[in-house]
């Protein structure tokens, strides 16, 4: 009998499969399709201090290797999430959940995390530092180790919950950013977020997305995710949530060998709503095929002699 259990920042997971933020809503839509309590946990929709209506449509475009999205962090704001979304979520998901947090200043990140700190069902805070710093010329907080560390410290000061910093693949040196986050008090890191990309409509001769650019996700970015998880594992000693183009149980094993403790599944949920359930069902079979008894034994296994 194989063992799929892992521990993420001190909290146990039945398995390492985590639907990624922005691809799973607040869970209750998917709960109408299958019992989402089979998941390790999930990261709910990115939450900001005030409501955001998101970018104009169209927001989604396809490419051969996956999807481009430019949703623009549409969400009702942290107060409405606490008042309306979390009570509904509790009815369908009976495990700790991961709260994804976004902000446009260091203070804003801290305010949102402070408000979520008292929510019992929130097990982890996943802090998305791919957002533009409106006080720093618009560059993403995660593009530079110093700004990434500043956000990490500010969040660490206002919460006792495990803090997982979600890193941008656009950083010049993602391992240096991860190291800075660890030194500033992060309990874990998650990577990779989407990559900036664009498609152009040949008939209109204009970008397919109303916003012009969007985040690339899907199988086309998986090898990049594996490389970056591998690099970050060698730079830090805190757990990694690996993600980026995951669509099979074998992908989960590959990212864990690269160094991930848990694995996020994003675009696959938009293509097939039951994707995570299938990956979880397939995981024991894949483990047996490759002679893996316990998942924790293979974390970072590709680095060993």
Where are these regions (language model features)?
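N-terminal capping/small domains of soluble enzymes
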Residues: 1-97, 102-104
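Short beta-strand/loop segments at the ligand-binding rim of alpha/beta enzyme cores
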Residues: 12-18, 93-99, 158-169, 233-243
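Conserved, mostly hydrophobic/aromatic
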Residues: 19, 42, 81, 99, ...
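Glycine-rich beta-to-alpha transition loops that act as phosphate-gripper elements at the mouths
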Residues: 24, 100-103, 167-173, 222, ...
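Catalytic cores of alpha/beta
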Residues: 28-33, 109-119, 171-184, 234-236, ...
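Glycine-rich phosphate-binding active-site loops on the catalytic face of alpha/beta enzymes
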Residues: 44-49, 129-131, 188-198, 245-246, ...
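C-terminal helical cap(s) of enzyme catalytic domains, especially alpha/beta-barrels
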Residues: 55-64, 200-214, 256, 268-293
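Glycine/Thr-rich beta-alpha phosphate-binding loop at enzyme active sites
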Residues: 67-68, 131-146, 177-234, 238, ...
């Amino acid at each position: 009998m194989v063992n799929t259990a892992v521990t993420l920042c001190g909290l146990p997971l039945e398995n390492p499969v985590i639907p990624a933020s922005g691809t799973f809503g607040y869970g209750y839509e998917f709960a109408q399709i299958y019992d989402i309590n089979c998941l390790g946990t999930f990261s709910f929709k990115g939450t900001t201090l005030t409501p955001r209506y998101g970018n104009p449509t169209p927001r989604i475009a396809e490419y051969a290797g996956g999807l481009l999205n430019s949703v623009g962090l549409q969400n009702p704001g942290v107060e409405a999430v606490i008042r309306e979304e979390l009570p509904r979520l509790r009815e369908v998901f009976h495990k700790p959940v991961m709260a994804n947090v976004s902000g446009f200043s260091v203070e804003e990140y801290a305010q949102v995390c402070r408000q979520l700190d008292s929510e019992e069902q929130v097990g982890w805070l996943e802090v998305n530092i791919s957002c533009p710093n409106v006080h720093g010329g618009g560059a993403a907080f995660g593009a530079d180790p110093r700004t990434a560390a500043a956000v990490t410290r500010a969040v660490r000061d206002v919460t006792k919950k495990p803090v997982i910093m979600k890193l941008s693949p656009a950083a010049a040196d993602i391992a240096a950013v991860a190291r800075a986050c660890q030194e500033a008090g992060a309990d874990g890191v998650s990577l990779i977020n989407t990559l900036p990309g664009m498609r152009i409509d040949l008939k209109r001769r204009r970008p397919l997305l109303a916003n012009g650019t969007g985040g690339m996700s899907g199988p086309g970015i998986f090898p990049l995710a594996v490389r970056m998880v591998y690099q970050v594992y060698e730079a830090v000693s805190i757990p990694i949530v690996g993600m980026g183009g995951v669509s099979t149980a074998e992908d989960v094993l590959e990212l864990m060998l690269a160094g991930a403790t848990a694995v996020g599944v994003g675009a696959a949920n938009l293509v097939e709503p039951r994707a995570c359930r299938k990956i979880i069902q397939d995981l024991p079979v894949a483990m047996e095929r490759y002679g893996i008894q316990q998942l924790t034994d293979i974390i970072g296994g590709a680095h060993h002699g």
